[in-house]
Amino acid sequence: MKRKLFFFTALTLMLACSCTGGRYETFSGYAQGGTYRVKVNMQGVKCSPETIAAAIDSLLEGIDFSISGYNRNSLLSRRNVGEEIVPDRYFSDLLELSAKYKELSGGAFDVYSGPLFDLWGFGFTSDSLPSDEAIERALADCKAGKVLNFNAIAQGYSCDIVAEYLYSIGVKDMLVDIGEIFCDGRNPSGKGWSIGVDNPVDGNDSPGSDLRGIWRSNGGAQGVVTSGNYRKFYIKDGKKYAHTIDPRSGRPVEHGLLSATVVAPTAAEADALATACMVLGPQGARELVESLDGVEAYLISSDGVWTSGGFNLEQQ
């Protein structure tokens, strides 16, 4: 279950905002089944806020038309029903990135695992569990590449695309929140951007209400994504089934990793790796993170916590 990190807003930050002479602008709207929020330092930017707002909306609409599984007219949806398509830049980018992270994760990240999610159902609302035969058929469909599903990387990638545009018009300080987060530079108080990391316990259904800590950026370009199982699960005959499906086995994971917060140079990378970590479990996730340059993580398991050396967490 991919959960949205929230933009940590403290009274001191709001006061700092009021002292900047209006240099920071916030843009918000609806995209990809939720809301987005983009905060930028307008110093040195010649574009008007109205122009930036329109450009962000246009970019997100273009991404939706390309890779959304919920838009029946998107390139992705048309491809999944057998129609021949001409991939655009977004579609091609995600195919390339997805292949990269599938290989890096040993198959723990796989955008062709859509048949498995269809089989198990979002949130596991079915009264009966899939049979072994049904799982094998779904795995065969995954191997054949019948259905693509970019959900595990699309929001992170969207953050990167919006950030790319902001860089092009001279923005240096930004926070892009489209379900996942990309940030660079400083917040209005002159510090690194602060992102709350939720405590992964049953019953914590409101992001930001129960925090494990606050992650603070180092002032550079960083994507940050949390993936977790504690809000989405199904109990059948006394057994708890996690929302995360292992695309290699076709079944829900059974390890003790509750959440994985990953920081990477891009939000797309953080998005894909957070998903892979939740499939791999505590040890596999740690090994994956330690093998990659520029990647940090905060892993919370049922029996402990692991923090990579460069993960900047301020405990609550």
Kindly give the residue locations of the regions a language model identified:
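Mature catalytic core of soluble alpha/beta enzymes
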Residues: 2-8, 17-316
